[in-house]
Amino acid sequence: MITQLQDYLAKTYGIHFNNPALLAEAFTQASYVNEHPHENLKYYERIEFLGDAVLQLFVSEYIYRRYPELPQGKLTRLRAAMVCEDSFSKFAKECHFDQYIRLGKGEEMAGARNRASLLCDIFESFIGALYLDQGRQAVEQFIQTVIFPKLDLGWFDHAVDAKTSLQEFLQRNGDVAIEYDLLSEGGTENDPVFEVEVTVDGKKVATGQGSSKKHAEMEAAKHALEKLRMDK
């Protein structure tokens, strides 16, 4: 299975491990080690510990540089959305890491291969093994392929307000003028409705409604992001 994993990593990501034992350790659960007591095997927990720290650092550094206007609180929320069990388990599935985990028979029968917590652990342990084997640059190349493009796909929009996401999306290739114009104000005193239009370099992109001008602007930005991503 580890040989197959090596072939898969080489073919898919151009990754060639110098020390296959690190890769084997990263994809081995304790239950497998317990069922093979005479093979002197190691399981992933120590490497996972390292991988978690590496991911925290690299993701923190990336979003710090990418979002120079984002305050500390919003950076923290964005990092928390990117560096979490839900995200890592999805990345692991996308990378097909679930197919290469070495599990004990009991854990296999219990469906551990699809367990989010295990997939998260395996993703972290792989990063730890890659860092030990090949260093910072290899890890950065991998996460630039697997993690960071998800920012442009809207995976983490819930952690950053839509206006910030729209600004970052549009200004990657240079400055553009983004304006929010109030189109109408209606409803009742207890249930007001505001409608706002967002324009980019003078061109109308989308509108949004909300119970306040701020909420309407957020909705307009959200709709603009959805439209621009579909058109991309």
Swiss-Prot record:
Keywords: Cytoplasm, Endonuclease, Hydrolase, Magnesium, Metal-binding, mRNA processing, Nuclease, RNA-binding, rRNA processing, rRNA-binding, tRNA processing. It catalyses: Endonucleolytic cleavage to 5'-phosphomonoester. SUPFAM superfamilies: dsRNA-binding domain-like (SSF54768), RNase III domain-like (SSF69065). GO terms for cellular component: cytoplasm. Its cofactor is Mg(2+). Mg(2+) binds at E48, D121, E124. It is found in: Cytoplasm. Its EC number is 3.1.26.3. GO terms for biological process: mRNA processing; regulation of gene expression; rRNA processing; tRNA processing. Transmembrane segments: none annotated. PANTHER family: RIBONUCLEASE 3, RIBONUCLEASE III. This is Ribonuclease 3.
